[in-house]
C-alpha cells in the first residue's frame, strides 16, 4: 500500500515538473505543500498513511532530487571519447562514444559486429571484448562476480577480457583499443550473424 502511494507521488511529481533544463528540489515542505493531497487516505488507511507521512517527513529524512533534461539536440554537446575496435581480420574501426554509454550499445550504433545476444543483461558472453592495453584495463572498475561468471564461458578468454555491456565509456578511457574475438559461443554454425536488437 505504501509503495503504491509512493509511486503515485513520484509519477505526479514527474508530470508536474516544469520544462526547464535543470531543476533541483529539496526539503519536506515542497512535498507537504504540493503533494500532500496524494498522501491523504480514506479513514480505513489513516493509520498507515500517518506512519508513511512520519517516515517521509521526519526531521531525520530529507527528500532531495535533481534532474537534467539537456541533450545533444538541445544545443549542448555530450562529451565523447575515441574508441578503436579491432575486428578478427585486424581491421581497425574508429568511433566516438558518448561518456556514460556502454561499449555494446556503441558498437551496435556504429554497425560493429559485436553480438550481445542477451541485450546487456549479463546472461551471455557474446559481447566479449579484449582490452588491448593494460593501462586502459587498469582504469576500468573491477568486474563483478556475475560478469566473471559469464566471462568464464567466453571464447578466447584473456587476462584483459571484459564484457562490452559492462564497460562504460568515461573520459579516462579516451583512446582505448578493443579487440573483438574471432568467435563467440552463441553464433550459429552456418555463419548467420544476428542483427543487433
Swiss-Prot record:
InterPro entries: 2Fe-2S_ferredoxin-like_sf (IPR036010), 2Fe-2S_ferredoxin-type (IPR001041), Adrenodoxin-like (IPR001055), Adrenodoxin_Fe-S_BS (IPR018298), Beta-grasp_dom_sf (IPR012675)
Pfam families named in the record: Fer2
Binding residues for [2Fe-2S] cluster: 118, 124, 127, 165
Extent of the transit peptide: 1-74
2Fe-2S ferredoxin-type domain segment(s): 81-184
A biological process from GO: P450-containing electron transport chain
Cofactor binding summary note: Binds 1 [2Fe-2S] cluster.
Cofactor: [2Fe-2S] cluster
GO molecular function, one term: metal ion binding
Localization, UniProt: Mitochondrion
CDD domains assigned to the protein according to its UniProt record, in alphabetical order: fer2
GO cellular component, one term: cytosol
Keywords: 2Fe-2S, Electron transport, Iron, Iron-sulfur, Metal-binding, Mitochondrion, Transit peptide, Transport
Keyword check for Mitochondrion: yes
Role of this protein: Associates with the adrenodoxin reductase MFDR to form an efficient low potential electron transfer chain that is able to reduce cytochrome C.
Family to which this protein belongs: Belongs to the adrenodoxin/putidaredoxin family.
PANTHER family attached to this UniProt entry: ADRENODOXIN-LIKE PROTEIN 1, MITOCHONDRIAL-RELATED (PTHR23426:SF34), FERREDOXIN/ADRENODOXIN (PTHR23426)
Record's protein name: Adrenodoxin-like protein 2, mitochondrial
Originating organism: Arabidopsis thaliana (Mouse-ear cress)
